[in-house]
């Protein structure tokens, strides 16, 4: 713990202009990034008496050992640079917007050659468009079931697609016309892309054109006395209307807007966002944010920060998706028209709407609006509605934020009490200096010494931190069908803590111009500079799955590396005994102990993660062919070879001259293939 007075800038050295500042810890890592209209005024707040600071702020300034700043020309540039640095450095003490990923969504993998629509629940991925979220999983599946009548988009997994592609016949959905069957070439890549574009356009809110088209097609078929086709179009029209009727009109003027509200208590804030397109609610999202202050101005700044970070991330994601679509489109015959369609759609369906309606105004509305305007490339209106339907909807969103916060508080109190008790029990039972806020656990998985792998799982504050999970292929302690569990544990511990020591020695690269003034062009920093050093912080407790031998091996590695500030234990499966280094007898925790339960959770999670990775490795090995290891023989040539001879077994019967007859196989490669398939043969012989 450092004393802020030791690194407080000298009086008069801090400028009074707008800027962005960074606090760094003893290893030089950026732990907090902030912006200010007046740098001197803002930074002086951090060097007050520690007793008057918010606990989180107090912890930050006592962790830091230096502060730096960059002067910019305007507050808009400060907002943009703050966002850039937060994305770049991922500071530990900056506010984390914890997205509520429990709601299901309808996803479309537009980055694939043949995109598919599917049910999804989780974080966003590149090359995928998301629609929703929905309140229930069945709502996603019902929507998909109804829409595939009108837009027969692919919905199967890659494995199913490849299987039917090789079989040459479609699945059931292809037979009943709820899939266009691109797997067997019933439609081309460009034709399927048109279906996908129509599906995405409908989900984005452009429903009227679909209704008009189906109505006209139904009437035309009826007039042509094609009553069977007219009946199909009628059913399609009813399916579309059923979906649109499920979404009530909340704004009669057909507005495109996002409506946002914040509800807060002393510890956290709940942010709710409703996406309104063409006057109908198309989606709802929620976040929980930790507060650093209890003032009204802090909530205003929190909302401002959220608006900039949320829409900047959405625009970046949209650009990545569109770039993938363009890459796919370049393989199609209608490249020019599809690129034009994408460009038009980017303008018409920007992720930043024309109106951003907020229940209460954010800090510095003008500057916030300027940033959003630059993201949209056209006008954006950020305002608090005062009356009518828009005010009523803003109140509804605020009520949702209050309810989300209430539900979170109930869960928070229950979870926090239990987790605190568990960490306190571990603290007391092991005689640690403080409760272990970061705990790591490793486990080994293999079958009779094959595909030996290890997992490393991380819990912080008693909760899984899955972004820090790691998987290891055991290299030194395994091989030739043999496995040494004790040696494998030692290898994992050595690799993990060698990484820790290396990360601690790394000095963050600098591409900032501290103390300089700059305009917009200097805001475009390098995105590759700040690799997240997730393992630069050591755990307070490290757990190995095993008994005394595994613990002793792990302790030897820690001693070898000079790691003295990490507590080590092992948990034996049979009796759930806790083993400590150098102890002859295990520690027995009560069966009803919350501390034991948390340790078991870590052990079970490490086991689950390890066995999942082991199965993946085993599956990949079983799918491998002897042809995969031949140098110079890529996937395309392997496919041609197997297709020519019918199987690897038949290929083995072929001579070198017969192998050379295959298109793309030269004499040298044919010889390499023959030798690989006949390892006991004389290499010098020519068939």
From Swiss-Prot:
Q: Does the keyword Cytoplasm apply?
A: yes
Q: Entry's InterPro entries?
A: GIY-YIG_endonuc (IPR000305), GIY-YIG_endonuc_sf (IPR035901), GIY-YIG_UvrC_Cho (IPR047296), RuvA_2-like (IPR010994), UVR_dom (IPR001943), UVR_dom_sf (IPR036876), UvrABC_protein_C (IPR050066), UvrC (IPR004791)
Location of the protein in the cell:
Cytoplasm
Which SUPFAM superfamilies does the annotation name?
C-terminal UvrC-binding domain of UvrB, GIY-YIG endonuclease, RuvA domain 2-like
Which branch of life, at top level?
A: Bacteria
The answer to whether UniProt assigns keyword Aminoacyl-tRNA synthetase to this entry is: no
- Gene Ontology terms, MF aspect: DNA binding; excinuclease ABC activity
The cellular component terms of Gene Ontology attached to this UniProt record, alphabetical and capped at eight, are: cytoplasm; excinuclease repair complex
The UVR domain, residue ranges: 208-243
GO biological processes: nucleotide-excision repair; SOS response
What's a Pfam family in this record?
HHH_5
Its keywords, alphabetically, are: Cytoplasm, DNA damage, DNA excision, DNA repair, Excision nuclease, SOS response
GIY-YIG domain boundaries: 16-95
NCBIfam families in the cross-refs = PRK00558.1-5
Record's subunit section? Interacts with UvrB in an incision complex.
Any idea what job this protein has?
A: The UvrABC repair system catalyzes the recognition and processing of DNA lesions. UvrC both incises the 5' and 3' sides of the lesion. The N-terminal half is responsible for the 3' incision and the C-terminal half is responsible for the 5' incision.
Show the HAMAP family listed in the entry: UvrC
Identify its protein family: Belongs to the UvrC family.
**Name under which the protein is recorded:** UvrABC system protein C
Biological source species: Corynebacterium diphtheriae (strain ATCC 700971 / NCTC 13129 / Biotype gravis)
